[in-house]
Amino acid sequence: VAPDAAKVESLLEQAKSLADSLSFAFDTPSGVPNPTLFLNPEPRQSDETQNGIAGMGTLVLEWTRLSDLTGDDKYAQLVQKAESYLINPTGSPEAFPGLVGEGVSLETGEFLDSRGGWGGGTDSFYEYLIKMYLYDSVAFEEYKERWVLAADSTIEHLASHPNSRGDITFLLQFDGSELHPTSGHCKLLLCSMRHISS
């Protein structure tokens, strides 16, 4: 597709059309996007009162890139306003430096809990912090700082080793300062992302 300018332009037009169709998700009091939208019979938001950090955090790269490709800053402005609540959290305190909760209020942009970790529903937020820095290291230096803070806290507070296998590391979940010994495939992301950021 890339060598064919007409096809690239057609894909870009479709991406703009899709983003324009979904952009009303950000029409909330805080600018945090509503995670559930209905397009038929007419566009409307769900009754959701919060969004999760992964749902919010994964939009930032694609919508910022769309603004860069189209020269229309409106897409980047929408997602970066929402992302600002994740970068500079308020509400429920961080359980550990850089490690935020899961739910963010659509009304205020404040965190509603201090529960999280590197599982489904949370890990993508952290993943996109370092991806944004790699995308533009000048504009998104703060994202890298946030990533390093979260990674360092993860190593210090969430890393766990079985008594019988000190060479194996598991990452714990947290609810405030209380740690929970659960693990899953998403935890592998930290290892790969830590390698990328070093």
What are these regions (language model features)?
Residues V1-S198:
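Glycan-recognition and catalytic cores of secretory/periplasmic carbohydrate-active enzymes
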